[in-house]
Amino acid sequence: MKKLGLLMILISIIVVFSCSSGKKPLPDKIVFQTDYNAALKMATDEHKPMIIDFYTDWCGWCKVLDTVTYVDPLVIGMSADDIFVKVNAEVDTALARKYSIAGYPTVVVAGPDGREKDRIWGYLPPTDFYNQVQLYLQGKETLEDYLGRLKDEPENLDYLSLIAEKFASRSRFDDAIEYYRKIVALDPDNEQDHGADAMAAIYDTQARARDYEGAIATCKRIVEKFPGTSEADDAEAMIGYYTARSGDSRKALRLYRDYLEKHPASENAQWVKKRVADLEDNI
């Protein structure tokens, strides 16, 4: 009986080991697909969501995403259930246009058919990245979700801001500006700490749309409306930058020098000095 008991224990151990060894091992790294069409077929065949990372070689935060977020075990584990794709947006420009990529990194969370659920615009650390993807896959915190919430709370400044940012990330700049302006109208004097940020977001969005004159005009309004604030300081520094982007380097240089004379101790001073040096080298 004793021998029989030991034999049964041994058989049980063998059975358990056999069952566990038959499980698919967890991935130890993310294997990125680089052929979008092949990845789309794989996602369709396996009925798995797609995580599509649009990057460029010069994008600093793209590299942080690679070296911090994508090597974290929590995020690596996602690749067992999701198809990860990497797209160099400056090489596959057609795909970048298809998804209306507005900046880098942009990570599009899509269904097995490639249709977007929502996107992560910019860098997120591992846990935040994981949680945001899971929410999108559940239909939560998406553009459609927030538009639905806004119907019940049309003056919710947080919802308006999130919706505007989501439109901007999709290159829908006019829609983004419309929602940012709603925030400014509801908080014109920045009493709720939303109005000034919304105005700053407007000039950033105008610049992304290459409306540099509009961006400069918005910056000037911030300087006039909120003098002595960090928002005004940032906006004044950006006037020179957008002037340079519009093609008038000499005027931009004058604006930068005027800024440094007025704000020598500003947190933006070093950044402005770098812009001055760059312009002086090229004029």
Annotate each predicted stretch with a short phrase.
Residues 30-34, 54-56, 68-94, 104, ...:
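Thiol-based oxidoreductase modules, predominantly thioredoxin-like and allied folds used
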Residues 169, 185-242:
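Alpha-helical adaptor scaffolds
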Residues 73, 122-123, 153-154, 170-173, ...:
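Short solvent-exposed coil/turn linkers within tandem alpha-helical repeat scaffolds
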Residues 15-18:
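C-terminal motif of bacterial Sec signal peptides marking the signal peptidase cleavage site
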Residues 70, 102-141:
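Non-catalytic, surface beta->alpha helical segment in thiol-disulfide oxidoreductase systems
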Residues 46-59:
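Short active-site neighborhood of thiol/selenol oxidoreductases, capturing the structured segment around
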